[in-house]
Regions:
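Gly/Ser/Thr-rich phosphate-binding loop
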Residues: 1-25, 38, 48
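Conserved ATP/PPi-binding loop(s) of AMP-dependent carboxylate-activating enzymes
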Residues: 32-36, 47-78, 113-115
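Conserved beta-loop-beta connector loops within the AMP-binding
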Residues: 40-58, 94-95, 157-161
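Active-site glycine-centered loops adjacent to acidic/histidine catalytic or metal-binding residues
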Residues: 7, 31, 88, 112
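Short beta-strand-to-turn element immediately C-terminal to the catalytic PLP-Schiff-base lysine
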Residues: 16-20, 42-43, 60, 152
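AMP-binding/adenylate-forming catalytic core of the ANL superfamily
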Residues: 61, 66-67, 89-176
Length: 181
């Protein structure tokens, strides 16, 4: 058996839990809301998003902090209407399981599209020649930012930019790295 718990020091408890072997098909999930905990995912305006859409994960439950010590501004940004805004970007699947996507501040905005580097990093990590990868936002006059991928190739292997481009054809065009290093 295994279990995964998701929580923050500000929540002092498992906002989400993922227990038992019956959930093995939910690899990568942080789980479902823990006992007496609630979760929701919201957009930039604080509105709940549709299931399957990405937004900021908010948690509510026993053990939630009351404030940041001597920092009312940070408290007001993080705690709103009894909800803790975690700064974690997440999505909920059709079975109610939550998956972390990235940190809110790690978003690349390219031509008005939100791109989460960890999604592209996970995708590129599946390529058999890739040892490690980091995806970053690079300034672009027309689009604001473009994606760049810094790739470390496995020992004894060679990999061309063309190979990576071909592999990335499975990604939506706006998510494909425009610069490969």
């Amino acid at each position: 058996l295994y279990d995964t718990n998701y929580g923050l020091s500000e929540s002092t408890g498992p906002g989400c839990v993922h227990l038992g072997m019956e959930n093995i098909h939910k690899v990568g999930a942080i789980g479902v809301p823990g006992y007496r905990w609630e979760c929701k995912i919201v957009d930039e305006e604080g509105n709940t998003v549709k299931q399957g859409d990405v937004g900021e994960l908010c948690v509510k439950g026993p053990g939630l902090m009351t404030c940041y010590y001597n920092d009312p501004e940070a408290t007001a940004q993080t705690l709103r209407d009894g909800w803790l805004f975690t700064g974690d970007m997440a999505m909920q699947d059709e079975d109610g399981f939550y998956f972390l996507v990235d940190r809110k501040k790690d978003v690349i905005v390219s031509g008005g599209e939100n791109i989460y580097p960890v999604q592209i990093e996970n995708f590129l990590s599946a390529y058999d020649k890739v040892k490690d990868v980091a995806v970053i936002g690079l300034p672009d006059k027309r689009l604001g930012e473009i994606t760049g991928a810094i790739i470390s190739v496995k020992d004894g292997m060679e990999c061309t930019e063309e190979e990576i481009d071909a592999f990335c054809r499975e990604l939506p065009r706006y998510k494909r790295p425009k610069k490969i290093i």
